[in-house]
Amino acid sequence: MPDVASNSMVDHIHTTLDWVGMSEIHLPARVSDTLAGERPVSTSIQAYVNLANADAKGIHMSRLFLMLEETFGDHSVSAGSIEQLLRNFLQTHEGLSTRGFVQLDFEYSMRRAALKSSYSGWKSYPVSIKGTLCEDGMRIELSVEVPYSSTCPCSAALSRQLIQEQFRKDFEESKVDTDAVLEWLGTEEGILATPHSQRSIAQVRVLLDHNVGDAFPITALIDSIEGALKTPVQTAVKRVDEQEFALLNGQNLMFCEDAARRLKTALNPQSCYKDFWLRVNHLESLHAHNAVAIVTKEVEGGYLPIP
C-alpha cells in the first residue's frame, strides 16, 4: 500500500510543524506513588512528535497509538517508561522527528480522614504527568489541582465591625453581665454578620528530576499543598468536624496573594522539585469573577509566570 504520510499526489506546502499527534486517547494505566504504591487509573492521553522534515507530508499516528498501548499495557507509568516511550516515538519517526511529548491526565483518588471524628471519605484530585524528550534531554513534569476553602480577611474585618456595633447597641444601657454576653454571642442577632468564603483551587506544576524512579510524589505534593493552606475541602463530616473546619477558616484568612505566598514558601525548600509554577484561583462568592495569583520558583531559564 502507498505510504500517504510520506508521499502524496496532492501538492503541499513545504514547512516544519512544532507538534503533530493525537489527544483524548483513553487508556487504562497503572501509576505508582511514592507513599501510596501502585494503583490503576483511567487516563486521557496526548501524544505528539514534531515534524522536522519540511518535505514530509505527515507523521505515522498509528505508530504512536500502538506504542502507547504496548508501553502502558505492559509497564507501570514511570519516568523510565515515559522516556523509553518517547525514544520509541523518535526511533519510529527517524528522519521525520526530533522531539516527542506525552501527557497523561487522570483523577487520583485518596482516602481522607475527617478533622476530628472517625469519619473518612474519598477525595479525587486532577493529576497530569508530562514527558518531553528533545535535544536538551528529558523533562518530567507533575501537575495537581487541590481544592480548598478561602475566607476573605476584609470581609472578616467588616463582619467583626458589625458585631461590635451591634454589641454596643444592645448593651450600652446596661452593666455587662458575662452570662448575658455569652447568651448574646450564641444568637443570630448577636453574630449578625459572617465573612464570605469560597471554594478555591490551587494548580501546581513541578519539574521533577528525570531520574525520579518508578514512583511519582503525587500524595507528597498534595499533602504539602494542603498542609500549607490549612483549609482543604472535606469529605464525610460530623458536626465536630464542621466546627473545626470553621475554626481553621477563621484562623487562616486568605486573599489569593496570601495563599500563593504560603505555597511558594512551602515548595521552595523542597529540593525534589527542580522548578515549580503555581496558580491559585479564588472562586469569589462576593463577585462574579475569580481572584487569581501566580508565582514560580524563579529559576533561571525555568517556568515563566504566564497565566
Curated annotation (Swiss-Prot):
GO terms for molecular function: GTP cyclohydrolase I activity. Keywords: Hydrolase. Pathway: Cofactor biosynthesis; 7,8-dihydroneopterin triphosphate biosynthesis; 7,8-dihydroneopterin triphosphate from GTP: step 1/1. Signal peptide: none annotated. Converts GTP to 7,8-dihydroneopterin triphosphate. GO terms for biological process: tetrahydrofolate biosynthetic process. The record marks C152 as: May be catalytically important. This is GTP cyclohydrolase FolE2. It catalyses: GTP + H2O = 7,8-dihydroneopterin 3'-triphosphate + formate + H(+).
